[in-house]
Curated annotation (Swiss-Prot):
Protein origin, superkingdom: Bacteria
Record domain J: where: 204-270
Gene Ontology molecular-function annotations: protein-folding chaperone binding
Keywords: Cell inner membrane, Cell membrane, Chaperone, Membrane, Transmembrane, Transmembrane helix
Xref: SUPFAM superfamilies: Chaperone J-domain (SSF46565)
Domain notes: The transmembrane domain is a dimerization domain.
SMART domains with a match to the protein in the record: DnaJ (SM00271)
Subcellular location: Cell inner membrane
Subunit annotation: Homodimer.
Membrane-traversing stretches: 7-30
Gene: djlA
Name this polypeptide is given: Co-chaperone protein DjlA
Periplasmic side stretches: 1-6
Amino acid sequence: MNWIGKLIGMMLGFILAGPIGLIIGLFIGHVVFDQGRFRQWFQTTASARSQPSKIQEVFFNTTFRVMGFVAKADGRVSENEIRQARQVMQQMNLDDSMKREAIRLFTEGKQPNFNLDESLNELRQACVFQPALLRVFLEIQIQMASADGQGLSGQKRQVLQTICRRLEVFGFDYNQFEQRFRAEQNYQRYQQRATQDPRAYLNDAYKVLGLTSAATDSEIKKSYRRLMSQHHPDKLMAKGLPPEMMKMATQKTQQIKKAYEQIRKVRSMV
């Protein structure tokens, strides 16, 4: 029965694009269906979707492996990058056993023979129905890439862009992602200062919501609700976010809420 995929592909290809489509459909039907790649992909993703614990395991393992890879992207791992890895472990409130495992995974990612594509492919398949988790993963990686405090080097940015392409997050724009991250960093520093002027760092507050000051009140409310829904800790955990990362998700929603409240206060929004 290994000819069914070819037949279906040929029929669809001919209907959509005539004789040329027939040839293309023959090839796609053979490679994707008859050779079992589609079946294998479906079985893998369906299995991951039905096992949240599997998603949590893959997410945790890939997060620390790729953090190690990103840290070593420019040839060496700095003290600031090691400190960032430890900070993530602290935020996750890992016990001694899990810390040792996280360190092992981080070290594994630094090795020259680390297979980035294989690791990302496993994560992508596990989270194929959970793009919100992939966004959390990317946020952790850009934090690592920026740990030196000197901005993103060309090598680190190239690695991040490669990771984004491999994960194939629908509707994801890397440049917007990096811009929002920078705004969040600036806004966090603003929050740690004593000034109470709500107009300070207002542009960064807009960027935290993925907007500009030209946005309408309606657009601001819509973006706020969307981001709060995307990053809600309980929702993320239900989708497969490891329980240890709940604190990080909570901090994210708190920052989104503070940015929204600052904008609302300046605009006198109801």
